[in-house]
Amino acid sequence: MVLADLGRKITSALRSLSNATIINEEVLNAMLKEVCTALLEADVNIKLVKQLRENVKSAIDLEEMASGLNKRKMIQHAVFKELVKLVDPGVKAWTPTKGKQNVIMFVGLQGSGKTTTCSKLAYYYQRKGWKTCLICADTFRAGAFDQLKQNATKARIPFYGSYTEMDPVIIASEGVEKFKNENFEIIIVDTSGRHKQEDSLFEEMLQVSNAIQPDNIVYVMDASIGQACEAQAKAFKDKVDVASVIVTKLDGHAKGGGALSAVAATKSPIIFIGTGEHIDDFEPFKTQPFISKLLGMGDIEGLIDKVNELKLDDNEALIEKLKHGQFTLRDMYEQFQNIMKMGPFSQILGMIPGFGTDFMSKGNEQESMARLKKLMTIMDSMNDQELDSTDGAKVFSKQPGRIQRVARGSGVSTRDVQELLTQYTKFAQMVKKMGGIKGLFKGGDMSKNVSQSQMAKLNQQMAKMMDPRVLHHMGGMAGLQSMMRQFQQGAAGNMKGMMGFNNM
């Protein structure tokens, strides 16, 4: 049972409260039994599960509750709160300082995904505008430097290592000195792992740590070992000053929940989680948003962060056009590019309320990305006049020969081109209506600039454009309106970013 299954089972248990006519002790106990069973199946320690059950029971006294209170919501809130506590170590995680040289040393057992995770962390900060680099001080595993070199080259991250020097302390020291002299902000050092916790591994870790004096030591933990993570994390903490933990392989193992709760029990803050093989299958770990996404409640704050990463604030020309209700094929092409930059579709969908982390399978995700690339390939075969025309699809309807030319140039059928134009027309019509809403593109809090009736019209337009299944997952019109309200408040008028979001 992977994490998505755990989320689905707990959500199903909580949903049973809505189906019950009367909320009594029997209904509460049945729901808690389902939640606890799901946690035990995910290899969460039985003591932690019992504690969660007792805490919820003590927080909810059905007999003492006033009749006007919403018992369902209070029970759901109590369960949510306890699930957050389950994965929260209660310790603030270390964060790098911008403009400073932050040395991060990675430790862990062999096979935990340490080298790949080094590259993922460097890439994560690089995308956020930090100057990052990688150092391979793993001289024990054959091919470690080749792997790091390959990952770094693919992501265009500077790296340092040696095929001849066998002393990891020398390599780490030289690499850190080199990158400090070049004013790198994030300096990541990968160290040797072993198949088990050998004394020689700990001794080597201490030597490297003493030589480079890292600002943060990150322990990389394999989620597949479940609650055994606790003993392993404690063993490393006793030997070196482990400040943070990254849990890997959470995408495909039944014991992910057990691993997360076990690490939290050691009071070690989890800073990131690995959710796949690709370099962007990597997410910051924040307890409340994590549980919120797990239960299909979304993470609007995380979504806004993703949008802001795109640096869409510079796109003043597009905003000016939107004010006047104009949207060209080139604009749509650029929005598709923004979506591609935001990372895996499943990661983005998990941030939208109503979608669980399992809504889009890996196969569906690849299919969606392939479709998006196909649409962009079609637009690559269009000329400037077609891409920049404010008449949009009318240019093609007036001269059907253009459709045949674009189809030939992009290697698709004329029907594919027509489908693209139909999709574009829907977007353009919505933008035209948005342009008529005064205050929508004004600075400040959008909820104050736009009237409720205007926002209702905009929501209706969005609902018409959406796949009915998607709208259903969001909780219908009420769910869409709730999400838009959250987005307004969180984005504080950042409508520029929302354009990248609306086109998903």
Curated annotation (Swiss-Prot):
Signal peptide positions (record): none
Annotated GTP binding sites: 108-115, 190-194, 248-251
GO biological process, one term: exocrine pancreas development
Subcellular location: Nucleus speckle; Cytoplasm; Endoplasmic reticulum
Region (M-domain): 296-504
Domain of life assignment: Eukaryota
An example Gene Ontology molecular-function term: GTP binding
Residues covered by region (NG-domain): 1-295
Sequence similarity: Belongs to the GTP-binding SRP family. SRP54 subfamily.
Function description: Component of the signal recognition particle (SRP) complex, a ribonucleoprotein complex that mediates the cotranslational targeting of secretory and membrane proteins to the endoplasmic reticulum (ER). As part of the SRP complex, associates with the SRP receptor (SR) component SRPRA to target secretory proteins to the endoplasmic reticulum membrane. Binds to the signal sequence of presecretory proteins when they emerge from the ribosomes. Displays basal GTPase activity, and stimulates reciprocal GTPase activation of the SR subunit SRPRA.
Subunit: Component of a signal recognition particle (SRP) complex that consists of a 7SL RNA molecule of 300 nucleotides and six protein subunits: SRP72, SRP68, SRP54, SRP19, SRP14 and SRP9. Interacts with RNPS1. Interacts with the SRP receptor subunit SRPRA.
Name of protein: Signal recognition particle subunit SRP54
Source organism per UniProt: Mus musculus
